[in-house]
Structures are given as C-alpha cells and as structure tokens.
C-alpha cells in the first residue's frame, strides 16, 4: 500500500495553492493524501466552487476515490487512480478562476496515455489568478522549451464577479522533460500595453493607456472592445519582452476605482519587476516549480520568494524526491534543484 501524505492546509500562505499542488502531485505520483484546515488562512475557509471543481476534475481524470468533496469542507481525502487522457469539460458555476482549475489537472495529463483537451467555464479575468493570456503568452513558451506541449485558447471572457468565461487547453503527453535555465532575463526588446473592455466606456481604456505611456516607452498599445455580454469588466496588461523571457503583468479594474489608479497599480508592479535583475516575476515563479521538479534540474531567479512560492516548494518536496535550494545574492533569489 502506498504511503498516505498528511498535509496541513494552514501551512504557508494558507490558501488554495496547497490543495491544487497536492492534487496535481497525487495524480502524477499515485500517492494518496489527506489535507485538513483547507484555506484556513482565508476569511471564508474551506472549499469554494473553484476548489471543489478542481477536486472533481482531478478525480474524474484519474478515477480517484474522494472524501470531503463538498462546499465549505476543510478536510479532504484523495486516493488517485490511473490518469487517462480524453476530452474533459468542467463548469465552476461562478467567477472562480478557470486557469487555476487547469493548473491543477494539466500536469497530470503530461503523463496520460494520449492527448487531451480540457475545457473549463467560469472566470477568466480574476484579480487573484493569472489570466489565460498569461498562460498562453508567458508560461506555455517556457513549457515548450522543457518538452511540454500544451496550447491554451480563450474562447470567451468572463470577468469577476459575473463569470461566464470559457478557456480550453489541448495537451500532449511528455516524451522527455528538458531543464530550464532562467538566471538572467537579458535586455528588454519591447513592451506592449493592452486593455480589455466589456460593457465599459472606451475612455476608461484610453485613460489607462495614457497612464502606461506616461511611465514606459510602449512599442504597441492595443484596446480590445469585447461584446457587452462578456462583462462588465476591464483588464489592463503590460507585457515585457526580454531576450530570454517574456513576462506579463495585469490588473483587473474595480468599481469605483478610477482608470488612472488601476493603471498606476500596474505601473508600480512592472517597475518593481524591472528594478530587479531577476528573470522571473512572482506569478510565474509559482508556475515553474512543478515542471522544474519533474525535470529534476533547472533554475530561475526571482526578486523575492513569495509565500505562495515557498508553500508550493514545500508541497512538491513532500511528493517528489527532489530538494530545492534558495540562495540570495546580487539582489535576487536563485531557485534551483539541489
């Protein structure tokens, strides 16, 4: 009988990252786990619709036996079966993040018996989760370098809090994992600003772009008007293309927050990234831990290790025979497999 891994959901950042990482790793390794205190560090602890959808999606893909899979549950037992490729569709039923559900199940499908397609409906532009364009334009090119081939398509936007968006990813089994070396980002090649609008006046986007232009030299400035029924919503993004990596930063607009303030938040985040010589931003660092661990080698630099990153590393080390090293030097933290 395989050993049971016991996890404390209050560990580290105390949110859903522990659960998502554990589900991915359990499916890959075949190791069962229990987790208590799910999202103990949040104002509303326990499983929300997004987390419950991730659990049910993982269970369907690997025919797992699950206990505690219900809204509000703070305890879960997950016994995985065999991962099967196929065509899967999952509905969150709220504006919960589609990409976080995909993030949970796609790594397991790298080990499936054939190609797969996973479609998730819910929220696509959520202030607490990476949008589909981040996955598509930033993460997936790096995964391709590692021998991981998946392609994400944003079918329909769904802004928080209404939801209604659809994201799909096609993924193939991985033949061989390659190592990723991202010690330096290199010189900046170009920067691109983009604003999405749905049911929001165009002058909002124009003011957001003006704020970005006031701080950066942009090679491109794009405003995309989406159908009104995909909103109301607004997202402003800035993409930084460097010699070795492309990073993308975003802020989701909020009611009663001016366009200038929304864009200024983005400017602050991008300036913080550019102020450090680190190659990888905070969100991307979280996403690279698992594929790097599966490759068994590699490294990247980040300005500061976030609580999400440290939590993710701790969970990975419980399931896989790897150890990460974090070394601070020259204004960055170098994260590597020891």
Swiss-Prot record:
Q: MF terms per GO, please?
A: ATP binding; RNA-3'-phosphate cyclase activity
Entry binding sites for ATP: 103, 283-287
**Does the record carry Disulfide bond as a key word?**
no
Q: Which keywords label this protein?
A: ATP-binding, Cytoplasm, Ligase, Nucleotide-binding
Oxidoreductase found in the keyword field: no
Q: Which GO terms describe its cellular component?
A: cytoplasm
Name the Gene Ontology biological process terms.
RNA processing
List, alphabetically, the PROSITE patterns matched.
RTC (PS01287)
List the EC numbers from the record. Answer: 6.5.1.4
InterPro entries referenced in this protein's UniProt entry, alphabetically:
RNA3'-term_phos_cycl_insert, RNA3'_phos_cyclase_dom, RNA3'_phos_cyclase_dom_sf, RNA3'_term_phos_cyc, RNA3'_term_phos_cyc_type_1, RNA3'_term_phos_cycl-like_CS, RNA3'P_cycl/enolpyr_Trfase_a/b, RPTC_insert
Q: Which reaction does it catalyse?
A: a 3'-end 3'-phospho-ribonucleotide-RNA + ATP = a 3'-end 2',3'-cyclophospho-ribonucleotide-RNA + AMP + diphosphate
Active site at: 308
User: What is the top EC class of this enzyme, as a single word?
Assistant: ligase
What this chain does, per the record? Catalyzes the conversion of 3'-phosphate to a 2',3'-cyclic phosphodiester at the end of RNA. The mechanism of action of the enzyme occurs in 3 steps: (A) adenylation of the enzyme by ATP; (B) transfer of adenylate to an RNA-N3'P to produce RNA-N3'PP5'A; (C) and attack of the adjacent 2'-hydroxyl on the 3'-phosphorus in the diester linkage to produce the cyclic end product. The biological role of this enzyme is unknown but it is likely to function in some aspects of cellular RNA processing.
Q: Which NCBIfam families match?
A: PRK04204.1-2 (NF003246), PRK04204.1-3 (NF003247), RNA_3prim_cycl (TIGR03399)
Protein's name according to its UniProt entry? RNA 3'-terminal phosphate cyclase
What organism does the UniProt record list as the source?
Answer: Escherichia coli (strain SMS-3-5 / SECEC)
